[in-house]
């Protein structure tokens, strides 16, 4: 017998909606804080007990809610943020569906005090979505919402929650993203009375980065910006030498909303291409402004994913912006000193002279070594060394430096080799200090740039082979190569059919290494066959990386002084001499000051 179709009760509908909107305590925090942001708050307090399972309190100084609208706010799809269908495609607020408050109230005990500041405030109490009490009262302007006994009437949901530290980590991550997206708002977050985050809301994104990731990372960040007809991008990118093992430190923010978008993350990684080791990811915060009409935020229950109508153009703009920002900098990482260094007075240093030295143009520094005032949070925070936020932090604008100073042709200074360690590392010096160079990585970078340029030229200058090379393949590989012959020609492989499942090669580009032609051809073909589909751009890139790695000097290879000098001089001519194509560092510097500090010559 067929079952009758019935309309669900509001209580059941709210619980179903809560299953999408309220997955865990972090979801509650996200929705309520976003409401506070939409209300125009400048200060938001977030007080959490037992990772949100016991109590979540959000206090803001926003616009508040009129008394006659308080009960309506807990009805499904009741909102003040959109009025008609057209508004749905021009969303300027973080929330707009009117689902958060009724969904949260349906699975918890909730109380709210709110006031517009012009009339008496209103207090409302709900349990499981039902209004228990509503009364007038005296309240300051703004809203305070307290959520307790979360999931008390849906015990199955509790089974799927993680440990308290994990749930607290989820809350912290949400608040970190919101703080990065809104540096003009002061966020004060505490757990069980212990302050975990405080930002001062002065609009300085770098200070928020310092509060979240630490001052040392903020010091390693550089401003980035780009603009087109459709997009305006600003933010901070941390130098490649500081990286992480996952993508969690990549923050993309569109119109004040933190979003997850694979294409944009891929574009960011492309901007850092060859600057990061394989399997490592950057720390970067990008704030992107665009017309709401070209971004659809109504495609995900938690609004974390969006649909962009000009995604490819935005990705290209991001990649180019990052590449240009780092291309202006000297990216030689400093040698790390084991202990944290405090500010010391610099005594007179030993003067070192080099007869061959030429005057070096001064390289812009990211931060001056002047003392930086510390900001000690109040109210929710207590003084703690790791929680100090920079009140003022010198900024570095690469564009300004370029306008006022002639760019040196070489991106690294002249270095004079003084020896080799383990036949693997070159030691060199100049008036700036000591340099350690990975000889394989250095030549790999040089050869990579050479091969990348040659492969991209698609030169028709060919060297005829005295003895043509015949290559045989299994039938499946032969068919794939037959389909991709035109693309292979663009990287210098000219295949002619020669019998069953065979090709003959009669010529090759003139830049192929002598006496290694067949090996080179096979490696390029193997590279093409290893990919599920052949992209000419990727094939050129992968081929250049493969050839540069295999044709470079290896570790345990002794070099003469002349060889080392030639290698270092050639490295100076590279466009990006700081990392190998795989992202490993080529060169590390120990400044004269750092060395003298190690030997206690400066106090």
UniProtKB/Swiss-Prot annotation:
It comes from the Bacteria. CDD domains: HATPase_MutL-MLH-PMS-like, MutL_Trans. InterPro entries: DNA_mismatch_repair_CS, DNA_mismatch_repair_MutL, DNA_mismatch_S5_2-like, HATPase_C_sf, MutL/Mlh/PMS, MutL/Mlh/Pms-like, MutL_C, MutL_C_dimsub. GO terms for molecular function: ATP binding; ATP hydrolysis activity; ATP-dependent DNA damage sensor activity; mismatched DNA binding. Keywords: DNA damage, DNA repair. GO terms for biological process: mismatch repair. GO terms for cellular component: mismatch repair complex. Belongs to the DNA mismatch repair MutL/HexB family. HAMAP family: DNA_mis_repair. This protein is involved in the repair of mismatches in DNA. It is required for dam-dependent methyl-directed DNA mismatch repair. May act as a 'molecular matchmaker', a protein that promotes the formation of a stable complex between two or more DNA-binding proteins in an ATP-dependent manner without itself being part of a final effector complex. This is DNA mismatch repair protein MutL. It comes from Listeria monocytogenes serotype 4a (strain HCC23). The lineage of its organism: Bacteria, Bacillati, Bacillota, Bacilli, Bacillales.
């Amino acid at each position: 017998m067929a079952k009758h179709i019935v309309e669900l009760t509001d209580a059941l509908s709210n619980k179903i909606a809560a299953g999408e909107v309220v997955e865990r305590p972090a979801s509650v925090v996200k929705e309520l804080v976003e409401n506070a942001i939409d209300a125009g708050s400048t200060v938001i307090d977030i007080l959490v007990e037992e990772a949100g399972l016991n109590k979540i309190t959000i206090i803001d100084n926003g616009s508040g809610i009129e008394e006659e609208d308080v009960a309506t706010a807990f009805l499904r799809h009741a909102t003040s943020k959109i009025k008609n269908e057209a508004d749905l495609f021009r969303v300027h607020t973080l929330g707009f569906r009117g689902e958060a408050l009724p969904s949260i109230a349906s699975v918890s005990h909730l109380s709210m005090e709110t006031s517009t500041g012009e009339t008496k405030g209103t207090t409302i109490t709900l349990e499981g979505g039902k209004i228990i009490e509503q009364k007038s009262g005296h309240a300051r302007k703004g809203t305070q919402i307290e959520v307790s006994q979360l999931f008390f009437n849906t015990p199955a949901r509790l089974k799927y929650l993680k440990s308290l530290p994990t749930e607290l980590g989820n809350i912290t991550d949400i608040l970190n993203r919101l703080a990065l997206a809104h540096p003009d708002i002061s966020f004060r977050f505490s757990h069980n009375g212990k302050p975990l985050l405080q930002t001062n809301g002065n609009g300085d994104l770098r200070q928020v980065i310092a509060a979240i990731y630490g001052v040392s990372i903020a010091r390693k960040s550089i401003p980035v910006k780009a603009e087109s007809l459709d997009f305006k991008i600003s933010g901070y990118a941390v130098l490649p030498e500081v990286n992480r093992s996952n993508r969690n430190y990549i923050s993309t923010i569109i119109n004040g909303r933190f979003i997850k978008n694979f294409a944009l993350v891929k574009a960011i990684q492309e901007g850092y291409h060859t600057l990061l080791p394989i399997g490592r990811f950057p720390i970067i915060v990008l704030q992107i402004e665009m017309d709401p009409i070209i971004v659809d935020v109504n495609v995900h229950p938690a609004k974390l994913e969006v649909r962009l109508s000009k995604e490819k153009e935005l990705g290209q703009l991001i990649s180019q912006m990052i590449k240009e920002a780092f291309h202006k900098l000297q990216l030689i990482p400093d040698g790390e000193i084991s202990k944290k260094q405090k500010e010391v007075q610099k005594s007179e240093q030993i003067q070192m002279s080099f007869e061959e030295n030429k005057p070096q143009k001064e390289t812009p520094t990211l931060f001056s070594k002047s003392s930086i005032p510390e900001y000690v949070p109040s109210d929710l925070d207590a003084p703690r060394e790791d929680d100090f936020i920079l009140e003022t932090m010198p900024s570095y604008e690469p564009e300004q430096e370029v306008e006022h100073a002639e760019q040196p042709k070489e991106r690294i200074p002249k270095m004079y080799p003084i020896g080799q360690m383990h036949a693997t590392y070159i030691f060199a010096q100049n008036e700036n200090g000591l340099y350690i160079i990975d000889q394989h990585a250095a030549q790999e970078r040089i050869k990579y740039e050479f091969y990348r340029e040659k492969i991209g030229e698609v030169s028709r200058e060919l060297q005829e082979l005295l003895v043509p090379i015949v290559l045989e393949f299994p039938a499946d590989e032969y068919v794939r190569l037959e389909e991709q012959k035109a693309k292979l020609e663009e990287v210098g492989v000219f295949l002619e059919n020669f019998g069953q499942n065979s090709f003959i090669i009669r010529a090759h580009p003139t830049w192929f290494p002598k006496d290694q032609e067949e090996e080179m051809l096979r490696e390029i073909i193997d590279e093409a066959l290893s990919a599920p589909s052949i992209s000419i751009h990727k094939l050129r890139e992968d081929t250049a990386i493969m050839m540069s790695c295999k044709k470079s000097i290896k570790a345990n290879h002794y070099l003469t002084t002349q060889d080392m000098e030639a290698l270092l001089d050639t490295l100076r001519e590279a466009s990006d001499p700081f990392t190998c194509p795989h992202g490993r560092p080529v060169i590390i510097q120990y400044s004269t000051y750092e060395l003298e500090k190690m030997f206690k010559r400066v106090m």
